[in-house]
Amino acid sequence: MASKGPSASASTENSSAGGPSGSSNGTGESGGQDSTFECNICLDTAKDAVISLCGHLFCWPCLHQWLETRPNRQVCPVCKAGISRDKVIPLYGRGSTGQQDPREKTPPRPQGQRPEPENRGGFQGFGFGDGGFQMSFGIGAFPFGIFATAFNINDGRPPPAVPGTPQYVDEQFLSRLFLFVALVIMFWLLIA
């Protein structure tokens, strides 16, 4: 029994290596086949295997993703030689599910996701980066955007606060404070 095991595995290797019998069910060979056909990107068994002109083996889904994420610089992930969809050759052999070109079936594009905007508290009208800064150009008292400002067109400011809210009270206080400061400056200009 001990001598029968090694000779059986040797005959299986001989028939799979050069014989026309085709497939074998030996577990020793599947381990060797897995190590022979490894993708150079995911380092797993190559599914829908393609080989580049420089001789490197890849899964087509892995290589497709590699090429899609680098559209301006399409190089081989291993040796940095030029590579594209047309410069790879599909491999057909044992273990392949069909004789269809793997380059014809591209992986589906993932759905886009739009996150909800963040709600920022406090005064949103101050600062240059948040859209609170507004500028209009004009000559003298006639700004070019007079109609846009008169009819509130393309205005990025938030709506006024509802009377009775703490924001409304704060805005009224600031308005009165700035009016008082303006009156003091005008009075100082008159007496100076």
From Swiss-Prot:
Zinc finger extent (RING-type): 39-80
UniProt topology in membrane: Multi-pass membrane protein
Annotated GO biological process: autophagy; defense response to virus; ERAD pathway; innate immune response; positive regulation of ERAD pathway; positive regulation of innate immune response; positive regulation of type I interferon-mediated signaling pathway; protein autoubiquitination
Residue spans of biased composition, Polar residues class: 1-14
GO molecular function: protein-containing complex binding; ubiquitin binding; ubiquitin protein ligase activity; ubiquitin-like protein conjugating enzyme binding; zinc ion binding
Pfam families assigned to the protein according to its UniProt record, in alphabetical order: zf-C3HC4 (PF00097)
Pathway(s) this gene product operates in, as recorded in its UniProt entry: Protein modification; protein ubiquitination
Bias-annotated ranges (Low complexity): 15-27
Intervals, Mitochondrial intermembrane compartment: 152-171
Assigned keywords, A-Z: Autophagy, Endoplasmic reticulum, Immunity, Innate immunity, Membrane, Metal-binding, Mitochondrion, Mitochondrion outer membrane, Transferase, Transmembrane, Transmembrane helix, Ubl conjugation pathway, Zinc, Zinc-finger
Location(s), subcellular: Mitochondrion outer membrane; Endoplasmic reticulum membrane
Domain of life: Eukaryota
Positions of the UniProt region annotated as Required for ubiquitin ligase activity and protection against ER stress-induced cell death: 29-80
GO CC, any one term: endoplasmic reticulum membrane
Sequence intervals crossing the membrane: 131-151, 172-192
EC number of the protein: 2.3.2.27
Reaction(s) catalysed by this chain's protein: S-ubiquitinyl-[E2 ubiquitin-conjugating enzyme]-L-cysteine + [acceptor protein]-L-lysine = [E2 ubiquitin-conjugating enzyme]-L-cysteine + N(6)-ubiquitinyl-[acceptor protein]-L-lysine
Cytoplasmic side: 1-130
Region called Disordered, residue ranges: 1-30, 90-123
Subunit structure: Interacts with ATG5 and BNIP1.
Protein task: E3 ubiquitin-protein ligase that regulates selective mitochondrial autophagy by mediating 'Lys-63'-linked polyubiquitination of BNIP1. Acts in the endoplasmic reticulum (ER)-associated degradation (ERAD) pathway, which targets misfolded proteins that accumulate in the endoplasmic reticulum (ER) for ubiquitination and subsequent proteasome-mediated degradation. Protects cells from ER stress-induced apoptosis. Responsible for the cotranslational ubiquitination and degradation of CFTR in the ERAD pathway.
Comment on protein domains: The RING-type zinc finger domain is responsible for E3 ubiquitin ligase activity.
Name of protein: E3 ubiquitin-protein ligase RNF185
Organism name: Rattus norvegicus
